[in-house]
Structure formats: C-alpha cells, structure tokens
Amino acid sequence: MNNLSSQNIGTSLDFQESPGEFEEEEEREEDDSSEISSLPPLTQVATASPRMIVSPKMQNIHLIIQNEDNDSSEVNTPHEDWHANLGLGIQSQPLRNERNVEEHYRTRAKRQTILWAENQAEEDTMTQERVRAEAELQVKFEGARAKAEARAEAEASSRAGLSTGVNGANRTVEDTKSTGEQDEMTRKTAERERRLRAEKERLLIEEDARKKAVQVKLEKEKEEEEEGKAAAGRTTAAPETPEDQEAQRIAVEIVQGIYKKISHTEYANFLGTKENHRILKRFIILLEPLPNSLVLSLYKLVTRIYFIAEAQAIDRILEELSIRWTTTNPATHWGSHYNLCHIVLFSLLILNSDLHNAENNQPKFSKEEFTENTLFAVEKESSKSNFDLAQHEPGIREELGVYYEALKYMSLPLLKKDENKTNVRDSRDSKDTRIRIRRRNSKMSTRSQLNNSTENSSSDDDTSVISSSSPSARREPHYTSNWKFHHNKPLPRLYRKEPLDEVFVFSNGTSWCVDSGIKMNERDLASSSNNKSTAQRTTRSRIPSSAGGIFRWITRSKSKSLLHGNKSPVAFFDGNTKWINVRCRVCEGRIYVFKHYPPSMGPQNSMQDLDGMKKASDVYFVCSLYESLATLVQDNVVVNNNHEPSRRGDLDQRGNFTVIIPASLHRKKTLLEFQTSNVEEAQRFVQCVNFWAARLTPVPTAQFEIVSNEENGWSPRVLSGDLPIETLETLYLSDWRPLLSISHLYSEQENSTEETNMVDKIEVLESFAEYLQRTIDSHNTVKPLMISRWRRTRNFERAMDNWNKKYLYLNELNERTSVYLNALQLAQRSVKH
C-alpha cells in the first residue's frame, strides 16, 4: 500500500466521487472502526464458546489483526484530531493525500479480514459438529456389529451343543435297541427302497409308453395334415398333389358306389392293395364320424362296400380302420394301441362267420369262449406294446360280451349287394367263370388263399384291376399255367429277376434249368395232362360262392396230411408199372412235360421254343412249382420188367424222384413219379424243382392258428389241473387238423416275389427253421402233462392222437423248410465255385 504512486491514486475510480462523498464515507468508516475497536479481542470471541476449537491458522490471523489494530490506534490519533478540528476539510482536495488513501485501504482490509475470520470460524464449527456426529454414528455401528457377532457366536455355540446332545441321545437310543429291532428296521428300509425302485421303473415304463403313443399320434396327425382331411358332408382342403386329388376322387366315388373302373364287388380288393393305400386312407376318413364301438364301426364299414375280398386286403382295411378309430376315440381303454383293436376287429369277423355260417357244423362260440380266446390273442400282442391288460381287463371283458350279443342278433352284411350300384362290368362279372386266386395276408395269422384247378381258371385272371395295378409278378395257381399254355396265353413271370437269373436261367444242368428226356409213370401223365381231345371241355360253370363267403379260407384241409395225399410212390417198386418216355423241362418256376415221338433221352436243348415242343407233342401239361416238393426216392430201385442190361452186364442203376403238387380248393394233391437214366440226373431235377419252389413259396408265418373254441387236449385250462376227472370225462375233444392248409399260412403279399431276393429268403428260412424247432420242443413239453391229466379218462386215446397229429404236421413242415433252405444254399454255393 505504501508503494502506490500518487498518479495512480489520483486516477482511481475510488477518488472520482463528488465533493463531500469522501468525507461522508470516511465518517462511516470511522464509526465502523470505532464499533470494531469496541468489540472484544478475537481471542476472547474464539474462546468465549466452550464448543469453539481455534485452529493454529486462526490464531495466526488473530495475532495479525491484533498487531494491525495496535498500529492503527497509533496512526489514527493525529487523524482523529484533524477530523475533529476540520470537519469540512474532507471537501478540500488538498487534504486527500497519499496517507489518507493508505489509511482508508488499511481499515477496509482489516474489516474484510475480520469478516473472513468469523466466517472461517463458523465453517470450522460446522465441520467439527459433522465430524463429531459421524464419529458417534461410527461408534454406534461398531457397537451394533460387535453385538451381532457376539450373538451369532452364541447361537452357533448353542446349536453345536444341541447337535452334540441329540447325537448323544441318538447314540444312546440306538445302543439300547436290540439286534432284532435293528434287523427289522433294515428289512423295512430295504423293502421300502425296493418298492420305490419298482415304482420308479413302472413310472418310467408308463412315461416311455406315453411318449411313444404321443409320438405315434403326432406322426399320424402330421401325415393326415399333409394328405388333407376329408369328412362326409363338409368341405375340406384340396390335396396338394395331383395324385392326392385323384386318390380323393376315387375314394369319394367308392363310398358313393359309382366308381366305374372296377366292379363294386372288387372295391375291397382294390382298397386293400399296397399301391392303393393312399385311397384307402381317404376312404376310411370318409366314414367319419366313427362310432365309439368297434362292432358298430365294423358294421358301418361293411355296409359301405362289398366286403368279400382277399384276406390280405381285408387285413389292410381293418388295420387302417383301427388306426383311424383309435385316433378319433383316444379316451377308450385301448388308448393309441390300434394293433389291439385290429385283433378285436378280426375276432369279430371270425365270430360273425361262426355264428351265422349255415354250413358250419362245428360247435358255436359261446360268449365265454369268444372272450377268453380274444383276450388270449390280445395278451400276446399287448406284451409287445407296453399295454397294461390287467388294468383294463374288466372293461375289455364287458366290452367283448356286448359285442358278442350284438353280433348274435345282428349279423354283418358281408354278402350284401346293392343292385343300384352295379355298373357295366357287373354283367360280365355275373357270367364270369373265374374264381380269383390271390395270396393272403393277416397279422392275426389268418393267412389264406383260394386255390383252384384248370377247370376253374381263366385267362382273365391276370387282367384284373388288382393284378394290372401292380408291376410285380403275382401268384399263379398250379394248373392255371396249363390252361394258359394250352390256349396260347402268355405265361406271366413268377419270380423276382436277379443278376444271376440272366446268366443261368436257361443253363441246362444247373439249379436254374434242367431239360432232359426221362421216363414218367403213364398213369400220372394221363391224370395231369390236358390233351387236345379234351381241351374244349375244360371250361365249366362257375362254382357258387356260397361255401363260406369271406371265411371259406378258414375251412380245414380235407387231406389226411398236409404234405401227403392218398397216393404213394409205389410205381418204382411195381413191376407192372408202365413207364413212358417224356421230355421234362424245369425252368422259371414251372415244370413242363411233353410226350412226343420219336422219344429222346438225355439232356436236351434248353433254349428250344416251347411252342414248337407243344406242337410236336400229343400230350403235355404245365404246372407252377409254387409249394411243390421234389424228393429223391432212392439211389437203387428194384428193376421192373422193362429193364435193359448195361454194357457191363449189370442192371442199370436208375434214378427216381417224385414231385408233389399241393392240393387246391377242388383238387387233391398230385404225386408225379419220374425215372432217370442215372442218380445224378435225378438229383439235378430234385435240386432244380426245390430251388424254384423255395424262391416262389413265401415263408409261413410264425403263428399257425387263429382264435379257436376247439379243445384238442392241451389247452391251459386242461393242463392246469383245475378240472376234475368228471369234467374231463364229459369234455368234447375235437380232432386236430391244421386250421389252414399250408398255402393259407403265408404272410407274403401279392407282389412278394418281387420284394424278396435269394439272400433274404435264405435268412428268413433259417429264422423260420429255428422257430419250428422251438415249436416242436414246446409241443413235446406238454406231452407228459397230457398223459397225467388224461390217462384215467376215456378221452386219453383221442387226446394223445391229437398230440401225435400235430407233432407229425410240425415235423413235416420242418422237413419241407429244411429242403427249401438246402436248395437255395446249394445254388448259392454252386455259383461261388
């Protein structure tokens, strides 16, 4: 302040005021300074409050202010005197010298310093209070935390003590228990764990079955959505593809009975073919809504179409009906197990035939027998699909009883024919002399077919809608080939072509072909041939179809044995047997026999045209080898009167073999007897015949009998020993015979020969041979039980005779299977070598 220049002071804004203002301001400043000087010292103010804490900084400021006050008091003494004496001197410009300015600023700085010190003291006081409050809060927090930790430690210590006490008490109690009580507790614990495991396994099985059922249902729904759903009386979305549209159109026309391409009597066969499955699905959908009763659903089905067809077609229709029924009726005790509903539907068909077939002379099914037999079949199938039969058995029994009563008084209209639905083709069908010959198939082992002879065949057989719709070869009745060959009709291919067939099919002397001049029993040729003099009388009127309707294929075989007829190969041992020279060719699944002159012996040209051979023969016949069986009789045969000495002077060693042609519906089995120049040639014929028979003949199913109410002597109720002797004495025993002939046992489809190759056929035959062996062993096990149950009754001989018949039948079938298997294996080995 002392260094300020006079020039700067004179030009300062503070000194540009009007005259008189400076004096007034100075008076005010003096008044303020007097007031300030009258205040107590800063140290007194700072220490007056007991809560004030004066920092060292504040003490230094106080000392500075105090020193300035002392200096001010010394300097202001002359000024005060000057002010008192010269009250108007403030208006005089000369009095405003540098000293006055310096005093003014010193006073002003002192006042500001005092104000700043006071503010700083207040701030320090507030800060101190806040710090003290925070300190007190921290102390309280630390105390609370310490108390909480102490309480937690106390609780932990208490729990540890309590646990120790409980454990000690438990140990004390356990020590006081006896060994027997401990064993009892262990046993109960183990039993409880076992029950829990069993319950867990049961739940897992149920869950798995539920998931599978849901998956099957979802797959069905997805498939139905893709193909489109059509219901009677309501509009549905059009199928996506032209094939779907065509299938929908045909299904609607079949339901309405106006489909013109086939007779209405062939609708069931048409729907049941594999290639028409898409049409079948839409046909079943058009039957909706399906009743919640299986018998009523079946009744609705058979009133829509003429339900006389092949077993295979019926089986497929019933299967699709079962699938659709379980889908639309999911709340029944059958759930999603359509395969069980399929069994029930087939049982209902069999029951209907049993109750209402006038030609059935067997005892009728009772309600109990029908129920027990159907439940037996359901039980076998339910074990494969996780169906709890025990849980639903009461309801199923009641349901089957209702079905029995319904069919007892309301037969299924299987033979119903609506004259209003006939079409142009019906008139020709009414005069047709054919009986359709097709292969049968059923999952309930109701496999069947209708066989017929030459007289009951027609070339139209192979131009039907069903056969023409399939590109595969169909089964041909044994003597249909003869009729076609005689009337110059083309012979269809009977087998599936394989690469080896192209090489060996006409290779003479192999498993594929044998063509040679041999001898044949003249009686066999006369009974088998279809010569020119009788050819015009081969067509007869059609045999009525009243012999059983759809269940004609359930009728029993009339032969005494399944594989052997009344005729035996005695010609080889009969010196009076007349042998004639014939040319025999075995090729492409058929056997051709020609009698012509001049006779030729030994191997022939297997490539020679058959028409030329036929023209050169006065007697001939052709037969398919389906189900046939060739047998080498013996290596050395007793020589007859026509023997010739050999060059060595010994008797010729001729070969002899037979060929059995199975029986058809109206024809007995045929036994053909042949004689060759040597055993090796006979062996080649036997191998070739059995090779083609094995390729053409489907493998029998694994189950041979349908649901039957007959008692043959080994039913479970008899073997259980629960029946008293009196009941066994009065029990009616039926004579055991195969329910179905061997041709009725096959599960192959109509085009099966197109689907099974040699390698697969060998594997299937091997599996079936093993099954037959197990079946024979199982049948042997019941013999001791039968003896113990029947030996004291008058039915003993009859029961054991039934057992023996079935045993012989199984052994014959086993022998036949082994022959077919060996023939295929031999052909396979010959190709490899």
From Swiss-Prot:
Keywords, ordered alphabetically: Cell membrane, Cytoplasm, Guanine-nucleotide releasing factor, Membrane
Ribonucleoprotein found in the keyword field: no
InterPro entries membership: PH_GEF_YEL1, Sec7_C_sf, Sec7_dom, Sec7_dom_sf
Ranges for region Disordered: 1-51, 152-194, 215-246, 420-483
Domain PH positions: 548-696
Location in the cell: Cytoplasm; Cell membrane; Bud neck; Bud tip
GO CC field: cellular bud neck; cellular bud tip; cytoplasm; plasma membrane
Any Pfam family the entry gives: PH_GEF_YEL1
Biased composition range(s): Basic and acidic residues: 172-194, 420-435
Composition-biased stretches (Polar residues): 1-15
Sequence ranges assigned to domain SEC7 in this UniProt record: 185-410
Job description of the protein: Guanine nucleotide exchange factor for ARF3 required for localization of ARF3 to the bud neck and tip and involved in actin patch polarization.
Protein name, UniProt field: Guanine-nucleotide exchange factor YEL1
